[in-house]
């Protein structure tokens, strides 16, 4: 058993899904050409005056409510002063003294079935910096499209004790934020980023160990790997009698290790002071009530609804609510008249397998709720079998309409007794031994005869109808 304990705190930056930036009217569009979505406020021109984005502040309030945090009633803005090429103003507008939310928590479910409450110290609404790109040819380029994009920074309490707990916390945090609708939390697009603080100390020590930072981790798995490596590195250093330095490190994915960026000799001095160009904002009870009433259904609420209304298992409901787009897709398919249980089975099984194989998000595929619903209804009304549905599923992932595909490819299941009975009688005429076996109590014979009918009809016969007709005809003989 280890003689050390680990302390982890996470700072998560979530890009808010607003139409314009935090303090200017520049649009927010991911993927646009460099420096297209900027103006003089983003550039920090002298004499220009910012204006706070009400939608960004309300998004921060929604995040605070989703994370069970208290909302600050009088919010003022602060300048965080630092120089870096992607920050032409040489300061960032943030909420150092009066964060929009404080003293919240997130409940995580551990693999052993127990729960743990991870504290939320505070949530800040602030603006993002631009983006540097280094060509390696002796110069760097700066794209200010991201400059001024509104963020909410979520700072956890340092009561995360392991890389596994950190991973569970990040997954739950992403789910909670995504279901509010304030962010798409796509890490691959930079709309969710993680800064890690980790220290290790001997069990029973009164003081925390020396904190090491790992900056700008853009994957939950990377965060888990970085923490696992850094936890072991610090333990090894302490076991060897070395002192842990106060450092900033980065995660190197190919080696799954952390690499030193710089040594910190003291705390950063950002010379915070109140932003003189933005007024204090009073958050009233009525405003909080209005924002709270606008919060959509949470993931936990959906899980309860899926269990109570559609008789899904807790595990099925949990898988369907891992992402907002999957939950919304499920609701749309069921609202279109598809069987809730069969819909859940297809989304959890075939659809998830397809997404894993193609490495696509559901919204980026050609699959639509209407097409999946149409296929499921064709199964339930007996038009196609579950075996034929495999071909139809492949077609609808390519954007084809299920009913048209079935008709075009002759996949309509043969269910008409008037057409099936002559075929079945011909099979029976050719298999007298099977008839004798059945009458002798060998019930398995029915499976063989059903197989012969399916072979004769090229797999298009309805197995249920075939079974019923076979029993009826066998009794006549």
UniProtKB/Swiss-Prot annotation:
Any one GO MF annotation of this record: asparaginyl-tRNA synthase (glutamine-hydrolyzing) activity
Lineage: superkingdom: Bacteria
InterPro entries named among the record's database cross-references: Asn/Gln-tRNA_amidoTrfase_suB/E (IPR017959), Asn/Gln-tRNA_Trfase_suB/E_cat (IPR006075), Asn/Gln_amidotransferase (IPR018027), Asn/Gln_tRNA_amidoTrase-B-like (IPR003789), GatB (IPR004413), GatB_C_1 (IPR042114), GatB_Yqey_C_2 (IPR023168), Gln-tRNA_amidoTrfase_suB_CS (IPR017958)
Reaction(s) the record says it catalyses: L-glutamyl-tRNA(Gln) + L-glutamine + ATP + H2O = L-glutaminyl-tRNA(Gln) + L-glutamate + ADP + phosphate + H(+); L-aspartyl-tRNA(Asn) + L-glutamine + ATP + H2O = L-asparaginyl-tRNA(Asn) + L-glutamate + ADP + phosphate + 2 H(+)
Gene3D superfamilies given in the database record: 1.10.10.410, GatB domain, N-terminal subdomain
Transmembrane intervals: none
One of the GO biological process terms: translation
Keywords linked to the UniProt accession: ATP-binding, Ligase, Nucleotide-binding, Protein biosynthesis
Pfam family, one: GatB_Yqey
EC nos: 6.3.5.-
SMART domains, sorted: GatB_Yqey
Keyword Cytoplasm (UniProt): no
Enzyme class per UniProt: ligase
Main function: Allows the formation of correctly charged Asn-tRNA(Asn) or Gln-tRNA(Gln) through the transamidation of misacylated Asp-tRNA(Asn) or Glu-tRNA(Gln) in organisms which lack either or both of asparaginyl-tRNA or glutaminyl-tRNA synthetases. The reaction takes place in the presence of glutamine and ATP through an activated phospho-Asp-tRNA(Asn) or phospho-Glu-tRNA(Gln).
Protein family according to the UniProt entry: Belongs to the GatB/GatE family. GatB subfamily.
Record-linked NCBIfam families: gatB, PRK05477.1-1, PRK05477.1-2, PRK05477.1-4
HAMAP family the record matches: GatB (MF_00121)
Oligomeric and partner information: Heterotrimer of A, B and C subunits.
Protein name as it appears in the record: Aspartyl/glutamyl-tRNA(Asn/Gln) amidotransferase subunit B
Species assigned in the record: Oenococcus oeni (strain ATCC BAA-331 / PSU-1)
Gene name of the record: gatB
């Amino acid at each position: 058993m280890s003689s050390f304990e680990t302390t982890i705190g996470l700072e998560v930056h979530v890009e808010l899904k607003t139409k314009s930036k935090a303090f200017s009217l520049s649009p927010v569009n991911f993927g646009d050409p460099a420096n297209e979505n900027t103006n003089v406020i983003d550039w920090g021109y002298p004499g220009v005056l910012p204006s706070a984005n009400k939608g960004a502040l309300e998004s921060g309030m929604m995040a605070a409510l989703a994370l069970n945090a208290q909302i600050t009633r009088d919010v003022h803005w602060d300048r965080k002063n630092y120089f870096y090429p992607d920050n032409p103003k040489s300061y960032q507008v943030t909420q150092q003294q009066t964060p929009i939310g404080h003293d919240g928590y997130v409940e995580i479910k551990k693999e052993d079935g127990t729960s743990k409450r991870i504290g939320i110290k505070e949530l800040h609404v602030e603006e993002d910096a631009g983006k540097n790109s280094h060509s390696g040819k002796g110069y760097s380029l700066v794209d200010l499209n991201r400059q001024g994009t509104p963020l909410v920074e979520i700072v956890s309490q340092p009561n995360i004790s392991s890389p596994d707990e950190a991973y569970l916390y990040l997954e739950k945090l992403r789910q909670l934020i995504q279901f509010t609708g304030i962010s798409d939390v796509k890490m691959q697009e930079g709309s969710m980023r993680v800064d890690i603080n980790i220290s290790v100390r001997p069990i029973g020590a009164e003081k925390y160990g020396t904190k090491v930072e790992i900056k700008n981790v853009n994957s939950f798995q990377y965060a888990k790997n970085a923490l696992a490596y850094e936890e072991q590195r610090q333990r090894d250093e302490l076991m060897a009698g070395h002192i842990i330095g106060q450092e900033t490190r980065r995660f190197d994915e190919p080696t799954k290790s952390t690499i030193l960026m710089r040594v910190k000799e003291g705390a950063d001095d950002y010379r915070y002071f109140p932003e003189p160009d933005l007024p204090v904002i009073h958050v009233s009870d009525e405003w909080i009530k209005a924002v709270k009433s606008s919060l959509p259904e949470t993931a936990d609420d959906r899980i309860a609804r899926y269990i109570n209304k559609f008789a899904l298992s807790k595990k099925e409901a949990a898988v369907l609510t891992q992402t907002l787009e999957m939950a919304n897709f499920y609701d749309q398919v069921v609202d279109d008249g598809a069987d809730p249980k069969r819909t859940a089975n297809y989304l959890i099984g075939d659809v998830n397998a397809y997404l894993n194989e193609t490495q696509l998000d559901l919204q980026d595929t050609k699959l639509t709720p209407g097409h999946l619903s149409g296929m499921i209804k064709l199964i339930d009304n007996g038009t196609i079998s579950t075996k034929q549905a495999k071909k139809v599923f492949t077609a609808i992932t390519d954007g084809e309409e299920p009913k048209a595909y079935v008709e075009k490819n002759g996949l309509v299941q043969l269910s008409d007794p008037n057409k099936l009975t002559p075929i079945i009688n011909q099979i029976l005429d050719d298999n007298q031994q099977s008839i004798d076996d059945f009458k002798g109590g060998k019930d398995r014979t029915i499976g063989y005869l059903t197989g012969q009918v399916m072979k004769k009809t090229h797999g298009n016969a309805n197995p249920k109808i075939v079974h019923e007709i076979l029993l009826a005809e066998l009794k006549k003989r």
